[in-house]
UniProtKB/Swiss-Prot annotation:
Pathway as given in its UniProt record: tRNA modification; tRNA-queuosine biosynthesis
Originating organism: Ralstonia pickettii (strain 12J)
Gene that encodes it: queA
Protein name in the entry: S-adenosylmethionine:tRNA ribosyltransferase-isomerase
GO CC field: cytoplasm
Protein family membership: Belongs to the QueA family.
HAMAP family in the record: QueA (MF_00113)
InterPro entries: QueA (IPR003699), QueA_dom1 (IPR042118), QueA_dom2 (IPR042119), QueA_sf (IPR036100)
Pfam families per the UniProt record, alphabetical: Queuosine_synth
Length: 359
């Protein structure tokens, strides 16, 4: 049985990146290479990612756009509230987390940003529904604050509003950035295009649940949060063509990974689809759609650390994180990146053996 403690590690707090680097591709890249008998670590710059890719490979990006989902306000009684929009339900209605001394009552109003009132609707545990007086997305973008992760200790500024978005973000709805994509810029895309490396896009609107801690020691008892995703016919066809030509499918970020694996059939094929996913990937999972993964460094005891451990192998991830800490890599959303290959199941780890991939 895998326990939460299996995914714990000590991280010096000064390694938690508090700001993004001015140059997106100046971040570091830890390439984790696997041979038959060993795991090797290569310390590179993110721009060196091109050295590990081949013509005909397909990079799959999540094109969700972070919305300004955080509001401060008050009840009619004067009590303070903090609202974090979780997702847009329709043009005027959202699902939101609300922090206040007492839960607001259905039918009452909240004044947000000293600018407009929202009406509290039915509870949808652990969220509330809120009705906006005008199109919600318009008011969110005009009056909301960028929802930086809880471990980033400064208030969001104009630099964050640029750097906590990917350069290709186009579908608004996320409350957290797909952070592996933050390392790509237009110059790197031009280089990838010149090499014959293809790009595909999906959408998964990242919810605040991505930051929720796992509260059970037996991880099999954890209930995963649900997020909306969409695989377009164009992406499904690009993946089919890549496979047919012998290319590799490379997920940029764990959100792309979760969407692809949610849509994949047992034989590895994908069809266009959209809907909710609460896929929880832990060691023992047999991957169907993804060969390589670009990802940042994740929080101790997090579901994302479990995902990368499932993909690259628990011992490889433990060693990689120890190496990254020793080499003073920057961690979490504004931190550095890793390039991981899919590993066969390791001896003593649950699950079926799978085909390994090489860089």
């Amino acid at each position: 049985m895998l326990t939460l403690s299996d995914f714990d590690f000590d991280l010096p707090p000064e390694l938690i990146a508090q700001t993004a680097l001015p140059d997106r591709t100046a971040s570091r890249l830890l390439a984790v290479r696997r041979t038959e008998d060993a795991v090797h670590f290569e310390d590179r710059q993110f721009a060196d990612l091109v050295d590990y890719l081949r013509p005909g490979d397909l990079l799959v990006f999540n094109d969700t756009r972070v919305i300004k989902a955080r509001f401060f306000g008050h009840k009619a009684s004067g009590g303070k509230v903090e609202v974090l929009v979780e997702r847009l339900l329709d043009e005027h209605t959202v699902l939101a987390q609300i922090r206040s001394s007492k839960s607001p009552v259905e039918g009452t109003s909240l004044r947000l940003a000293d600018a407009f009132d929202v009406t509290v609707g039915p509870r949808a545990e652990p969220f509330f529904t809120l009705r906006f007086p005008q199109p919600a997305l318009d008011l969110i973008e005009q009056y909301g604050r960028l929802p930086l992760p809880p471990y980033i200790e400064h208030d969001p500024d104009s630099f964050d509003e640029t750097r906590y978005q990917t350069v290709y973000a186009r579908n608004p709805g996320a409350v957290a950035a797909p952070t592996a994509g933050l390392h790509f810029d237009d110059a790197l895309f031009a280089k990838l295009d010149a090499m014959g490396i293809r790009r595909g896009f999906l959408t998964l609107h990242v919810g605040a649940g991505t930051f929720q801690p796992v509260r059970v020691e037996n991880i099999a008892e954890h209930r995963m949060h649900s997020e909306w995703y969409e695989i377009t016919p164009e992406l499904a066809e690009a993946i089919r063509a890549t496979r047919a030509a012998g290319g590799r499918v490379i997920a940029v970020g764990t959100t792309s990974m979760r969407a692809l694996e949610s849509a994949a059939q047992p034989d590895g094929t994908l069809n266009a689809c959209s809907g909710e996913t609460d896929i929880f990937i832990t060691p023992g999972y047999r991957f169907r759609a993804v060969d390589l993964l670009v990802t940042n460094f994740h929080l101790p005891k997090s579901t994302l650390l479990m995902l990368v451990s499932a993909f690259a192998g628990m011992s490889a991830i433990r060693e990689a994180y120890q190496h990254a800490i020793a080499q003073r890599y920057r961690f979490f959303s504004y931190g550095d990146a890793m390039l991981l290959t899919r590993a066969p199941t390791e001896p003593g780890e649950p699950g079926e053996p799978g085909e390994t991939q090489s860089l």
